């Protein structure tokens, strides 16, 4: 019996959670269900990767979204009165757009409504969308947030949800520690991955510019990824005579800072910023070592994808990483500080044969295979097939 899902997300950009949403939605329609994706701010970058049967809607149009982010950037650069007035007007338009969307959705009904990212409140779904079940997906680890109190404002809304799904054991445990009253409705389901699509996309030939061994990182240029810290590590190893190049896929608010630090450290011939790509997998397959230097994660999806492609992985000890890798066997896990990253990377550069052994992809069945995740998810939805 087909089930009708509405999945609410702030925007479809090139992020880890957004990419696994593609796999999740495609898995549902593959099994005969209806899926509609609702963006708060229309971006739609990932739309071509969804199954053609997935439908889309947006609360705030693409034209408004572009004006909103342009105005936000101007306010950050020059917070003068005029900029604030323009920005506040655009925020007012969002409220108006939500009222229009509420009228539109009053005539629609769904079996399950999902708030797919914890950074956006589920209030719109709870107040304006008719559904039999409401589910909150929680992709981060609240213990690593600089300001976990910012999540507390959603506490009452989460109490109204039928279930909360966390994507790592650490994430679930820390969520329950902060919100013990939600323990009974909080569950662990790993992200969905389309292994066949990842393997197929990786077959596109690619050769990296620069020195070998090639180090690769994939992720937005934001503070949690700690790319500035990793540049210090690379400069130190360069000064010690090690050969390598580091390639980064992604964009973000820290790009300018990263570019400036590359110049200051004279790493222009060692570090390559490729920007956003719709196919990171051809890069992953061609790299010598995949590096996750993050300060914190909820459950890093890029390391799962790298292991699916047989990449050796060096990763900081963030939430979820020990659910993916066995240190010294299927990956190399280091403490989450600059010195540990330096020592770990230096050791692997000195022992390339160990890197090759770390290509082994074992012990990730629970993380990678979708069947068990699907069964647990439908049990939460109380859907019988």
Where are these regions (language model features)?
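Short acidic/histidine- and often glycine-rich active-site loop of Leloir-type glycosyltransferases
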Residues: 301-305, 318-328, 332-333
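C-terminal alpha-helical cap of glycosyltransferases
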Residues: 364-385
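Carbohydrate-associated surface elements
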Residues: 170, 192
């Amino acid at each position: 019996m087909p089930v009708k899902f509405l999945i609410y997300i702030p925007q479809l950009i090139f992020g880890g959670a957004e990419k696994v949403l593609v796999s999740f939605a495609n898995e549902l329609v593959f099994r005969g269900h209806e899926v509609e994706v609702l963006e708060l701010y229309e971006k739609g970058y990932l739309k071509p990767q969804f199954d053609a049967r997935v439908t889309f809607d947006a609360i705030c149009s693409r034209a408004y979204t572009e004006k909103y982010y342009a105005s936000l950037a101007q306010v950050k650069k020059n917070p003068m009165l005029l900029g604030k007035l323009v920005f506040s007007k655009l925020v007012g338009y969002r409220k108006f757009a939500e009222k229009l969307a509420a009228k539109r959705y009053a005539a629609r009904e769904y079996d399950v409504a999902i708030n797919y990212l914890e950074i956006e409140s589920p209030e719109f779904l709870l107040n304006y969308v008719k559904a039999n079940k409401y589910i909150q997906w929680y992709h981060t680890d609240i213990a690593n947030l600089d300001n976990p109190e910012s999540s507390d404002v959603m506490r009452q809304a989460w109490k109204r949800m039928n279930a909360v799904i966390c994507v790592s054991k650490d994430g679930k445990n820390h969520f329950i520690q902060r919100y013990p009253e939600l323990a009974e409705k909080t569950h662990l389901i790993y992200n969905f991955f389309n292994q066949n699509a990842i393997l197929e996309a990786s077959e596109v030939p690619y050769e990296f510019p620069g020195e070998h061994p090639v180090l690769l990182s994939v992720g937005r240029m934001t503070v949690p990824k700690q790319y500035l810290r990793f540049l210090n590590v690379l400069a130190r190893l360069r000064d010690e005579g090690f050969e390598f190049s580091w390639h980064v896929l992604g964009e973000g608010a820290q790009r300018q800072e990263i570019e400036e630090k590359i110049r200051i450290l004279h790493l222009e011939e060692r570090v390559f910023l490729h920007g956003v790509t719709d196919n990171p997998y051809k890069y992953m397959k061609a790299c010598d070592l995949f590096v996750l230097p993050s300060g914190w994660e909820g459950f890093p999806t890029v390391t799962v994808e790298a292991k699916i492609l047989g990449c050796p992985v060096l990763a900081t000890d963030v939430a979820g990483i020990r659910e993916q890798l066995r240190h010294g066997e299927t990956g190399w896990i280091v403490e989450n500080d600059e010195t540990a990253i330096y020592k770990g990377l230096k050791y692997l550069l000195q022992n390339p044969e160990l890197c090759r052994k770390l290509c082994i992809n074992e012990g990730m069945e629970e993380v990678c295979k979708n069947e068990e995740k699907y069964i647990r998810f439908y049990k939460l939805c109380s859907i019988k097939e």
